[in-house]
């Protein structure tokens, strides 16, 4: 669940159209491997899974590929499959065909005192086109919330890929 959303107009100079500064709590799903970036620097790569819960009881397991700069002598053996982990960093969304990939560039990793509950918490930044149709709705309890859509475009090889996003803002006032 993201705390806040920033909506900006489309920029041709930006490659990352949707990104989030987040803290993810989850379970390691793929063991760590040290790899080389194109420019020669090394990084640690591993996978994590986190479950996003729905009030209706339908839970969605999210797979995230994580990369973190490798520090010489760092023990990557502690990143074991099935271990609980908390990762802070930048989460990006990439679409290729029908598949949506979540990639995270980690700034901090913690294996100690990790919450037993899966979560994604942070701030989402969206560069794209927001719909002019903004609806103010009410919950069963009478609390107001705002619903609107937007889409982001990126070029993958010679094809354009579109990611449609539905935003829900739980505030009583409509933004100006």
Where are the language model's segments positioned?
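OB-fold and OB-like single-stranded nucleic-acid-recognition modules
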Residues: 2-176
């Amino acid at each position: 669940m993201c705390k806040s959303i920033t909506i900006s107009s489309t920029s041709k100079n930006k490659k990352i159209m949707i990104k989030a500064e987040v803290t993810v709590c989850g379970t390691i799903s793929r063991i760590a491997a040290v790899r080389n970036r194109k420019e020669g620097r090394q990084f640690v790569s591993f996978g994590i899974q986190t479950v996003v819960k729905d009030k209706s009881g339908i839970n969605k397991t999210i797979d995230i590929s994580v990369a973190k700069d490798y520090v010489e002598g760092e023990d990557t053996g502690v990143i074991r499959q099935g271990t609980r982990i908390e990762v802070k960093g930048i989460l990006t969304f990439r679409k290729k065909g029908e598949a949506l990939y979540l990639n995270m560039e980690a700034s901090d990793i913690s294996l100690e005192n990790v919450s037993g509950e899966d979560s994604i918490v942070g701030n989402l930044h969206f560069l794209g086109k927001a719909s002019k149709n903004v609806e103010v709705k009410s919950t069963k309890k009478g609390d107001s919330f705002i619903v609107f859509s937007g889409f982001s475009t990126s070029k993958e090889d010679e094809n354009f890929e579109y990611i449609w996003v539905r935003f829900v803002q739980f505030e009583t006032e409509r933004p100006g």
